[in-house]
Regions:
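Conserved glycine-rich cofactor-binding loop
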Residues: 9, 16-18
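Substrate-binding pocket helix/loop in short-chain dehydrogenase/reductase
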Residues: 100-104, 108-113, 142, 218
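The beta1-alpha1 cofactor-binding region of Rossmann-like NAD(H)/NADP(H)-dependent oxidoreductases
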Residues: 63-75, 109
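Catalytic loop of short-chain dehydrogenase/reductase
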Residues: 95-96, 109, 141-165, 169-178, ...
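Short, small/polar-rich loop/turn modules that mediate ligand/substrate recognition or access, typified
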Residues: 177, 182, 248-250
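Short C-terminal tail/terminal secondary-structure segment
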Residues: 18-19, 96, 101, 238, ...
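A short, exposed helix-loop element centered on a Lys and neighboring polar residues
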Residues: 127-128, 170
Length: 265
């Protein structure tokens, strides 16, 4: 299937590592020109060079912090200058650590506020700055990366920020839909990224068991019985970013391998 992404311009926040990196790679592989944004310059530039070398597509690294209005404004401005516009926005930036289930007395309000600022308000800032460009073109795709803890209790911070992102997405989808702009949410499950792979290696060494054992125990608790990887998420996001996904708007897509005994409707 030709996803018709050649010639499209995309911004991927949180694009230097993990799921964001995989998404940027797939978009470039399908022919999109991509700008990736993150706070760490070294990893960002290395990722941009790697993706560009592997896809023969231009990848622009932009140091940016979605928690800051001025940084987001400058990021979008530079991306538009370099790419000639913005057709696709993937909001993948997030603070690490929201999966930790702190007891109620130990929840740090400042940490909570920081996570909301980066992920939820950060996504809002990015959307506010790219939407006018998409409206002028009469076409756009915005994909917000949330997470399965929007559907499951266990982390107050993680659940709250992801539910907020879902609610915001639906409201914005209703507003931007008449302009030809689709806005969706993707819920990755526990995904075996570089960071989690390193953690699994440390756990395996500590327990004296094979790495595969730890990975299957921690990441294979889905119906498929295998870990979800960043590329699994990237395939779905890349489709949602394409003209082929016109019928999907304001909706949530889970990429978690299927949670046992759960029914979502």
């Amino acid at each position: 299937m030709d996803l018709e992404l050649r010639g499209k311009a995309a911004i991927v926040t949180g694009g230097s590592r993990g799921i964001g990196k995989a998404i940027a790679h797939e978009l470039a592989r399908e022919g999109a020109s991509v700008a990736i944004a993150a706070r760490g310059r070294e990893a960002l530039e290395a990722t941009a060079a790697e993706i560009s070398d592997e896809t023969d597509m231009p990848v622009t690294p932009i140091v940016a912090d979605t928690a800051r209005e001025d940084s987001v404004r400058d990021m979008v401005s530079r991306a538009v200058d370099v790419l000639g516009g913005v057709d696709i926005l993937v909001n993948s930036a997030a603070e690490v650590g929201s999966r930790v289930a702190f007891p109620l007395p130990e929840i740090d309000v400042e940490v909570f506020r920081g996570e909301l600022n980066v992920k939820v308000l950060g996504a809002l800032r990015c959307i506010q700055h790219v939407a006018p460009h998409m409206i002028r073109r009469g076409w756009g795709r915005i994909i917000n990366i949330s997470g399965m803890n929007a559907r499951n209790a266990g982390s107050v911070i993680g659940s709250a920020r992801n539910v907020a992102l879902v609610a915001m997405t639906k409201n914005i989808a209703d507003e931007l839909g008449p302009h030809g702009i689709n806005v969706t949410v993707v819920h990755p499950g526990l995904t075996l990224t570089e960071r989690y792979h390193a953690q699994a290696e440390a756990t395996a060494a500590e327990r004296g068991v094979p790495l595969e054992t730890v990975i299957n125990e921690r990441f294979g608790a889905n119906v498929l019985g295998r870990p979800m990887t960043a590329i699994d998420v990237a395939y779905v996001v890349t489709f949602l970013a394409s003209p082929k996904a016109t019928a999907i708007n304001g909706d949530v897509i889970a990429v978690a391998g299927g949670y046992p005994r759960a029914i979502y409707y």
